A protein has these predicted regions:
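Mobile beta-alpha loop/short-helix "lid" or hinge segments that flank ligand
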Residues: 68-74, 169, 182-184
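C-terminal regulatory/effector modules of DNA-binding transcriptional regulators
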Residues: 180-250
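Residues at helix-coil transition
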Residues: 34-35, 156, 198-199
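Hydrophobic residues in alpha-helical segments
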Residues: 33, 109, 132-133, 197
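Residue-level recognition of short, well-ordered coil/turn positions
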Residues: 37, 72, 136, 201-202
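Short linear motifs at protein or domain termini
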Residues: 1-111, 218-250
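Short helix-capping and inter-helix turn/linker motifs at the boundaries of alpha-helical repeat units
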Residues: 20, 118-119, 181-184
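Conserved amphipathic alpha-helical segments that form helical-bundle/coiled-coil interaction surfaces
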Residues: 94, 98, 115-177, 187-196, ...
Length: 250
């Protein structure tokens, strides 16, 4: 058997490595930050996080280093780790980029979407509306994020999808405190957007998406107008509950 044949056979049977514990801890902590269960400015105590997630302090420490490198956490020598508090300027800049990217996503999606895609978008809208009616912020934020992600997927542009995916978690983080304020208007705008996609009206879809994302951006800026370029004020954290990080590969 030739060496290249061995290499090809070996790659076909390669065993996937399990995700390191520190990475699973990082993912769990990132979601706690995005959902505001760990609030901006909150002091992150290693022992408390370890107890909450059911792990030792070592993967917590490693996860904090990773989150610091990604801008989710700030490490202050002698004081400890804190959830990053975003400034109004950084939120404004990211949401402006999001508006430009997703308006193009909508334009391209209108030219490619089929009946199944429209049906899925209608279901996501219904899920979001139901979450709004029962005041379920987490489900509302998730449905909103999934609508935007799916429209970008429908665009068929992999580079665009990659860029949008990079800002998606930040968008969810910024959207969570204003989801209730956006409320009914947001889901009405989503419905209009889906109508434009179904009508294969690329220009209308792009315009509605831009208006929709700009409304979200403006609501955030209006609600934080008094902050100027100061960091977002820490919100009162939710009651913490123990979360278990799986130790097996998933």
């Amino acid at each position: 058997m030739q060496p290249n044949e061995i290499s090809q056979q070996a790659s076909a049977h390669r065993i996937d490595r399990p995700i390191p514990l520190r990475e699973r801890v990082r993912q769990s902590m990132q979601e706690l930050i995005i959902s505001r269960q760990l609030a901006p400015g909150q002091h992150l105590v290693e022992s408390e996080l370890a107890e909450m997630l059911g792990v030792s302090r070592q993967p917590i420490r490693e996860a904090l280093q990773l989150l610091n490198s990604e801008g989710w956490v700030e490490l202050h020598p002698g004081y400890g780790a804190f959830v990053h508090s975003p400034t109004v300027t950084e939120v404004d800049e990211l949401l402006a980029v999001r508006s430009a990217l997703e308006s193009e996503s909508a334009r391209l999606a209108a030219e490619r979407v089929d009946a199944d895609g429209i049906a899925h978008l209608r279901k996501l809208c219904a899920d979001g509306q139901a979450a709004l009616e029962r005041d379920d912020i987490d489900s509302m934020v998730n449905a909103n994020a999934e609508i935007h992600r799916y429209i970008t997927e429908l665009s068929g542009n992999r580079v665009l999808l990659d860029f949008v995916s990079q800002v998606d978690r930040r968008v969810r983080w910024y959207y969570t405190p204003i989801a209730r304020s956006r409320g009914q208007h947001s889901w009405q705008e989503h419905a209009r957007l889906v109508d434009a996609l179904e009508a294969v009206d690329a220009d209308a879809a792009s315009r509605i998406m831009r208006e929709h994302t700009e409304h979200t951006r403006q609501i955030y800026l209006d609600e934080h107008a008094e902050d100027g370029d100061q960091t977002e004020q820490p919100a009162k954290p939710r009651t913490r509950r123990r979360r278990t990080v799986r130790t097996s590969a998933s």
